[in-house]
Amino acid sequence: MQAVPDIRIRRVNDQGIHRAGDFVVYWMTANRRLHFNFALDRALEHCRALQRPLLILEPLRCDYRWASRRLHAFVIQGMRDNAAEARRNGHAYAGWVERSPGGGSGLLQQIAARACTFVTDDYPCFFLPQMIRAVGRQLPVLLEAVDSNGLLPMRAADQIFPTAYAFRRFLQKQLTPHLTDCPTPQPLADPAVPRLSQLPDLFERWPGLCSDGELADPTGWLETIPIDQSVRETSYTGGTVAARQCLSLFLTRKLARYGEERNEPDADVASGLSPWLHFGHIS
């Protein structure tokens, strides 16, 4: 199994690994998928080295800018897919949706008290970098952020490019060595990773842990979340399953025409993957 390249791994704090901890935590924040994900691969590397099980934590805040029913529903549909994938492979998964602003305060520290180490996603946009830095200062164990944003690692570039043309020239020269570094297609299937038979008893003070039934049909309880309820769901379904269906449609019906018709809006030959790429449901 290929190791995660060092250039993709960033230490967020100066804490060490708590080798006597009960589990390794993958704190999912941007790459909300359990396939082809360097951050998940890194968490599993720690699991194998420490012989500790994995705890997958996928939280969703309610107080981020533009929080709406539409965005929440899309992310929660992805949680449903992730919960099913973790269950198929015998791993513990916690999909947690904040029910009131600040309702998750202290949760990560509580989990970290029993963890060996934390791994999260290294994503350069929105409120996530600031949040990761703040959490890193509060955790008593090592927090690593791992870049799984694209084929080229973010830290392979040592400058800000003034134009897309300048970046493309750099990319054409520098991308090739990184193309052989691939995340694992089915990382949770590894039999060498111990399994956590059930979720740790850590969530009583933080209501929001979602049952399979709540993830399957969030329609009713979403009404109780203090988000913009006027921005309703669309016909799009979130999650890896729907993302792969969209990708398959593009490859089988649109790709052959894309080269000549991509600039024709009425041709509808674009991939249509933007919503799923945005939330990391597919890479």
Q: Predicted segment positions?
A:
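Glycine/tryptophan-enriched, flexible segments
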Residues: 19-20, 160-283
